[in-house]
Amino acid sequence: MGIITLSGNVLHLLKAYPKKGLEEVSQPEPNTANDSSTEYKGKSKDDFQMVEKSNTDERYNFTRTKKWFLLMTSEYYKLMENRLLMFCIIACSFICAIQFLFFIIYWTNIVPRKTQRAITNLNYDYLTAHLKEQCVPYAKILDQCIL
């Protein structure tokens, strides 16, 4: 229970931090008409054109990014505030990790033991039947060795 309340407190702190940071960054800039500067553009020195520089595209991209970020953070926090869903995600990942570990232990420990047991008990029937299906010369060699 303590972990769930601690994670809830951390989520509330994280929820407040991005909104506070974005409010500081996205303060409205003063709109000055005299501040617009001009820029020369052209392919060669002879055909330059005077073009007015504008920050409207940059402001538009920033506001789009800000809105997208706020939307994503709010959806993330709505999702993570549901403690039952958070518990299910953690439990499923824990179960998957345990199953993966048992799978590794099985293939590194039990399968070689079964193969070794088959060889030590001189259980060549399986091996000869398998090799006879694969290639005819192996069947002749194994029949001579076993007999």
Swiss-Prot record:
Quote the subcellular location field of this record: Membrane
Q: Record keywords: 4Fe-4S included? A: no
Q: How does it sit in the membrane?
A: Single-pass membrane protein
Membrane-spanning regions, if any? 85-105
Which species is listed as the source? Saccharomyces cerevisiae (strain ATCC 204508 / S288c) (Baker's yeast)
Region feature (Disordered): 23-48
Q: What is this protein called?
A: Uncharacterized protein YGL230C
- Basic and acidic residues compositional bias, start-end: 38-48
Q: Which residue stretches does the UniProt record annotate as biased composition, category Polar residues?
A: 28-37
GO annotations of cellular component type: endoplasmic reticulum; membrane; mitochondrion
Task: Tell me the keywords, alphabetical order.
Answer: Membrane, Transmembrane, Transmembrane helix
